[in-house]
């Protein structure tokens, strides 16, 4: 991937428009988690430290285009950002009619981009209106990179200079390192409730990795493909043949899809359900598999410790219930102890990493849910493609 980076730009005396992802959750009318705001601080501070004025734009919630309601207002986000920066961050509601006059060191925020008509349809005129505000456009919203919208793609095409922010560049560099030029052996963990939601990821990674670990309902479907009885466990019988093809593809290249030989089962999916460890051959008809067993976890942990690159998407058990968390904990700790370059993404994965206290030991934690998954699938991310295109158009590569 070839794109300009904010940290390569001379922004002194310029106005920089940063598309951030500050779509934070609220509880009781207050921001309950400011992780996404903090994630883009590096880009904002780079601009301020180098003599620029900054305009931040973000989406918040899912408003109806052309309509404004109090819950759509980014004012609380602007106030929180201002608190972190030690500055007053004003919200601009009429920025199309009144272009802001800014001085170096100023920071302002546009009103919620998703109330603008044409935002979701990637309207070029709206993109031009955004671009007219700035000398340099910065996309720092990896979480929305898989969407072609006016504030991510059209603006990049219209801006004098379009580049990746510190967060965006970090995401793309880490993903590129993990998937484009991985240290071997490369191991991927893909887990979740359904093969159908991650089939394209499994197929794409099967071409790249040396070992493909599956977990959750996905593993159950693969166990069915191996002819194993899984009781009343969650599985997709109609995708057994697809699972067989993926296992055959891995075997043909000398790799494998290592499936559990022992599992943790229960008769009900509940926080107080009794957990029983069994060999896979002993799973009864009235039992469901809710985690991998200790022998399987130990074997997979050895694979991870010996890996050169690890890509992790999804917990291998119902880790929210402590009695079914052992497998995911063992793998998390193995990744933390491994010398491999590791990258992890997806909401449940991040929750597991936090629960087991290994955040600092993971090489890179992706902030993008859908964008992370689509990158794993090998899909083009529209917002990233726009940055690459503008670099080519400007004759820079």
Curated annotation (Swiss-Prot):
GO terms for cellular component: cytosol. Transmembrane segments: none annotated. Substrate binds at residues 21-23, 36, 59-62, 114, 147. It catalyses: (2R)-3-phosphoglycerate + ATP = (2R)-3-phospho-glyceroyl phosphate + ADP. Monomer. Pathway: Carbohydrate degradation; glycolysis; pyruvate from D-glyceraldehyde 3-phosphate: step 2/5. GO terms for biological process: gluconeogenesis; glycolytic process. Keywords: ATP-binding, Cytoplasm, Glycolysis, Kinase, Nucleotide-binding, Transferase. InterPro entries: Phosphoglycerate_kinase (IPR001576), Phosphoglycerate_kinase_CS (IPR015911), Phosphoglycerate_kinase_N (IPR015824), Phosphoglycerate_kinase_sf (IPR036043). One of its GO terms (molecular function) is ADP binding. Its EC number is 2.7.2.3. ATP binds at residues 198, 320, 346-349. It is found in: Cytoplasm. Pfam families: PGK. This is Phosphoglycerate kinase. The keyword Iron-sulfur does not apply. The keyword Transferase applies. PANTHER family: PHOSPHOGLYCERATE KINASE, PHOSPHOGLYCERATE KINASE 1, CHLOROPLASTIC-RELATED. Belongs to the phosphoglycerate kinase family.
């Amino acid at each position: 991937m070839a794109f300009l980076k904010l940290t390569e730009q001379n922004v002194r005396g310029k106005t920089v428009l940063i598309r951030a992802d500050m779509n934070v959750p609220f509880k009781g009318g207050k921001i309950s988690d400011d992780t996404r705001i903090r994630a883009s601080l590096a880009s904002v501070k780079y601009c301020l430290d180098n003599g620029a004025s900054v305009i931040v734009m973000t989406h918040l919630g899912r408003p109806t285009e052309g309509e404004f309601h109090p819950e759509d207002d980014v004012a609380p986000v602007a106030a929180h950002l201002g608190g972190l920066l030690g500055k007053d961050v004003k919200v601009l509601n009429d920025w199309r009619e009144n272009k802001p006059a800014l001085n170096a060191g100023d920071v302002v925020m546009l009103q919620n981009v998703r109330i603008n008509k044409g935002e979701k349809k990637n309207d070029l005129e709206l993109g031009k209106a955004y671009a007219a505000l700035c000398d340099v456009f910065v996309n720092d919203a990896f979480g929305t990179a898989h969407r072609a919208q006016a504030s991510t793609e059209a603006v990049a095409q219209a801006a004098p200079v379009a580049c990746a922010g510190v967060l965006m560049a970090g995401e793309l560099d880490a993903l590129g390192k993990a998937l484009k030029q991985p240290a071997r052996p490369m191991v991927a963990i893909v887990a979740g409730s359904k093969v159908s939601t991650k089939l394209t990821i499994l197929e794409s990674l099967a071409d790249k990795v040396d070992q493909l670990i599956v977990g959750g309902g996905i593993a159950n479907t693969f166990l069915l493909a191996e002819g194993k009885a899984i009781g009343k466990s969650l599985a997709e019988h109609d995708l057994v043949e697809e699972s067989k093809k993926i296992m055959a593809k891995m075997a043909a290249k000398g790799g494998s899809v290592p499936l559990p030989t022992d599992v943790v089962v229960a008769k009900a999916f509940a926080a107080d359900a009794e957990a029983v460890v069994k060999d896979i051959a002993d799973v009864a008809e009235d039992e469901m598999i809710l985690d991998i067993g200790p022998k399987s976890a130990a074997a997979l942990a050895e694979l991870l410790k010996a890996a050169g690159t690890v890509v992790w998407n999804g917990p291998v058990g119902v880790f929210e219930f402590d009695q079914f968390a052992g497998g995911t904990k063992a793998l998390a700790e193995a990744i933390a102890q491994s010398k491999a370059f590791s990258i992890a993404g997806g909401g449940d994965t991040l929750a597991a990493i936090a629960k087991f206290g290994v955040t600092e030991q993971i090489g890179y934690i992706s902030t993008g849910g859908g964008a992370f998954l689509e990158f794993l699938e090998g899909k083009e991310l529209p917002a990233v493609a726009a940055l690459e295109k503008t670099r080519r158009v400007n004759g820079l590569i």
